Amino acid sequence: MSHAVKIYDTCIGCTQCVRACPLDVLEMVPWDGCKASQIASSPRTEDCVGCKRCETACPTDFLSIRVYLGDETTRSMGLAY
């Protein structure tokens, strides 16, 4: 099951989320909106298993990357989102 992965413009281009993802769902792409001139992108969200390691690795106070679990997963885990 794929999950929605959202990258926000508060991304600082540090690559921590990309390196934390065990399934290579994320990659960095050019972007002029931050000092690093790159931003995380999620071209392979169909491979996301919802582990949220990318969220945990994000050093910004804003959680520049968020994984939104699909309905089926949240029900099976007993989570209310």
Curated annotation (Swiss-Prot):
Binding site for [4Fe-4S] cluster 1: C11, C14, C17, C58
Catalytic class of the enzyme: oxidoreductase
This enzyme's EC code(s): 1.97.1.12
Limits of the 4Fe-4S ferredoxin-type domain: 2-31, 39-68
Keyword set includes Transport: yes
InterPro entries assigned: 4Fe4S_Fe-S-bd (IPR017896), 4Fe4S_Fe_S_CS (IPR017900), PSI_iron-sulfur_center (IPR050157), PSI_PsaC (IPR017491)
GO MF annotation: an example: oxidoreductase activity
GO BP term, example: photosynthetic electron transport in photosystem I
Database matches in Gene3D superfamilies: 3.30.70.20
Main location: membrane
Bilayer topology: Peripheral membrane protein
Assigned keywords, A-Z: 4Fe-4S, Electron transport, Iron, Iron-sulfur, Membrane, Metal-binding, Oxidoreductase, Photosynthesis, Photosystem I, Repeat, Thylakoid, Transport
Residues annotated as signal peptide: none
Binding site for [4Fe-4S] cluster 2: C21, C48, C51, C54
Catalysis: reaction(s): reduced [plastocyanin] + hnu + oxidized [2Fe-2S]-[ferredoxin] = oxidized [plastocyanin] + reduced [2Fe-2S]-[ferredoxin]
Transmembrane helix recorded as keyword: no
Listed Pfam families: Fer4_7
Co-factor: note: Binds 2 [4Fe-4S] clusters. Cluster 2 is most probably the spectroscopically characterized electron acceptor FA and cluster 1 is most probably FB.
Any one of the GO CC terms: plasma membrane-derived thylakoid membrane
Cofactor(s), by name: [4Fe-4S] cluster
Location within or outside the cell: Cellular thylakoid membrane
Complex and partners: The cyanobacterial PSI reaction center is composed of one copy each of PsaA,B,C,D,E,F,I,J,K,L,M and X, and forms trimeric complexes.
Its job: Apoprotein for the two 4Fe-4S centers FA and FB of photosystem I (PSI); essential for photochemical activity. FB is the terminal electron acceptor of PSI, donating electrons to ferredoxin. The C-terminus interacts with PsaA/B/D and helps assemble the protein into the PSI complex. Required for binding of PsaD and PsaE to PSI. PSI is a plastocyanin/cytochrome c6-ferredoxin oxidoreductase, converting photonic excitation into a charge separation, which transfers an electron from the donor P700 chlorophyll pair to the spectroscopically characterized acceptors A0, A1, FX, FA and FB in turn.
Protein name according to UniProt: Photosystem I iron-sulfur center
Gene source species: Prochlorococcus marinus (strain NATL2A)
GN (gene name): psaC
